């Protein structure tokens, strides 16, 4: 990707997902979904049992990923998804699991 026009359309969001989201393949499924949507960023487990993610892409890509995160993979039981825009000049190269 190159050009200022394209960069202006890239958004970055920090997301927290709570519920039964660890030990159910949530991160792996999140990586698969992010790759399908051509998102960049990462996903990781937190000590409190929740999952965090950094999503980077266009507004429609982010919206579709947030919609998917609200239910996650079949074994998950999502009770809450919170997100906020994260202003950064950093550009992730791919989406990965931590």
From Swiss-Prot:
Catalysis: reaction(s) = an acyl phosphate + H2O = a carboxylate + phosphate + H(+)
What Pfam families has UniProt attached to this entry? Acylphosphatase
Species of the source: Burkholderia mallei (strain ATCC 23344)
Q: Where is the active site?
A: 27, 45
According to its UniProt record, this protein's enzyme class is hydrolase
Q: Which residues form the Acylphosphatase-like domain?
A: 12-98
Q: Which domain of life is it from?
A: Bacteria
- Record-linked InterPro entries: Acylphosphatase, Acylphosphatase-like_dom, Acylphosphatase-like_dom_sf, Acylphosphatase_CS
Instruction: Give the EC number(s) under which this enzyme is classified.
Output: 3.6.1.7
Residue ranges crossing the lipid bilayer per the database entry: none
Record's protein name: Acylphosphatase
- Please state the gene responsible for encoding this protein: acyP
**PANTHER family attached to this UniProt entry:** ACYLPHOSPHATASE (PTHR47268:SF4)
The family note in this entry says: Belongs to the acylphosphatase family.
Question: Care to name a GO molecular-function term for this sequence?
Answer: acylphosphatase activity
What keywords is this UniProt entry annotated with? Hydrolase
Gene3D superfamilies assigned: 3.30.70.100
């Amino acid at each position: 990707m190159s050009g200022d026009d394209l960069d202006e359309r890239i958004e970055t969001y920090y997301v927290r997902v709570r519920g039964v989201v660890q030990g159910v393949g949530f991160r792996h499924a999140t990586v698969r979904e992010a790759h399908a949507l051509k998102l960049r960023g990462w996903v990781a487990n937190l000590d409190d049992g929740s999952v965090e993610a950094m999503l980077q892409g266009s507004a429609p890509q982010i919206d579709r990923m947030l919609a998917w995160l609200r239910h996650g993979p079949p074994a998950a039981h999502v009770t809450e998804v919170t997100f906020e825009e994260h202003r950064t000049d950093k550009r992730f190269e791919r989406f990965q699991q931590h």
